Each structure stands twice: as C-alpha cells, then as structure tokens.
Amino acid sequence: MRREFPDAPIVGVGAVVLDGDRILLVRRGRAPLKGEWSIPGGALELGETLEAGVQREVAEETGVRVKVLGIVEVLDRIVPEEDGAPIEGGLSAIRVRYHYVLIDFLCASLGGDLCCGSDAADACWVARGELATYGLAQITVSVIEKAFEMRDAS
C-alpha cells in the first residue's frame, strides 16, 4: 500500500521506550515529519502483530531491543494535500496526502547498541527534563507524559 495519497488509512505503531528517567527519541529521516524529533515507530507490515511491529520498528530505527508493556494511546493523523496541517474532525473536500491510525505503546528497554538506522536520521536517549529542547509535537509530549504516568503507577 502506498503511504502518500493512500486508498485507506495505514496502521502505524509507536514506542515510548523508557529507561529510568530517559526516553528514546528519533529524528525522522523520511516524510511525513522528516527532520522532526519523535518516538520510534512506523507502519505495521501485513501479517505482523502489533507487538512484533513495535519491536521491529524500534530495533530498525535505533538498535534497541524492547519489551512491550501496554497501549498508551490510539490516535489518528490525517494530513491533507494542500498545506500539510492535520485535518480536524475528519474528511474534507481536500485530498488526503497521509492518513495514519497510530497505536502508541509503553516499552521498556532491554538493551542494545544505540544507532540510527533505516527511517531515522538520528537516535538518542533524552532525560525527561530535557524534552522541551527537542521541539516535539504537543501530542507526542502528551503521549510521553501519559507513558511515564502509566509506568509510575504500576
């Protein structure tokens, strides 16, 4: 299935990988969001379980192995052809350039050699208190904070 101007939404998985008070971030190497910092993730492959998809995406983008602990958030990202701003409230008369249904998971790091690969231009561990310096989208910050709350409550 093509990612740009798709015929149907694409299921994507994201990983909020925590290691103590640090979180794993990647700088996107491809559209959409090329050049922006975010959590590791990508499109689910045909026949792949959600857990396997999360583990594969994190390993491909960062070299880190993870244990999936649970779902943090389910959301969608719909970007129209025109200006690239997300569509609020659903479909419009504008052609949809990207449409992802995103399932973000809380994950624990199991180790591995940190490196950036495949879809990532960079990867790093960031202290929770330094997140504001990475220009993360507000929804990403909200998902990360929710993941810390989930982890700390268990």
Set out the residue ranges of the language-model regions:
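The catalytic Nudix box helix
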Residues: 39-72, 105
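NUDIX/MutT-family hydrolases
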Residues: 104, 115-147
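A conserved beta-turn-beta hairpin within the catalytic core of GNAT-like acetyltransferases
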Residues: 32-35
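Acidic, metal-coordinating catalytic segment for phosphate/diphosphate chemistry
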Residues: 1-14, 85, 95-97
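Active-site-adjacent beta-strand/loop module that shapes the phosphate/pyrophosphate-binding cleft
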Residues: 75-113
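A cytosolic small-molecule/anion-sensing beta-strand core signal
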Residues: 19, 27
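Short, glycine/serine-rich, charged loops/turns that create anion-binding
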Residues: 22, 30
